Amino acid sequence: MKFTYTEHLGLDENNQPITNDYKFLRTINTEKIFKDETGDEFNAQLGEVVSRLASFEQDPTDPQKASEITSLQFIETRHDVLKFLYAQTVDGVLVQNEDTRKEYEELDLPEGILFNQFLAKLTGQK
């Protein structure tokens, strides 16, 4: 499965958008990275988020796909996935505690940027 995540960096001196595109391809290798770096439940949530984003990217004019990625359930799932960006690995399991949750919430960055950072970290692209 392929999808592109676009990070919006602002505007240049000509008021043109500055973007950075990250292209992801879920392969056996990236599946192994996801499996090694995450637990089963988290991997399932990540898979759901990636799948819906990829589906929307393939046809952004489809109102059904647009409503799927803007639904409250999807946003909550994406939020849960992003919280693990600052989780710690303890005995081979990702653990989130008060310190990591507080660090995540204090960043106050748009979730799109955080999701981009997380995927780039998992795939070694950034």
Which positions does each model-derived feature cover?
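Short, intrinsically disordered N-terminal pre-domain segments
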Residues: 1-12
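Short, surface-exposed, charged amphipathic helix/loop patches that serve as local interaction elements
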Residues: 13-126
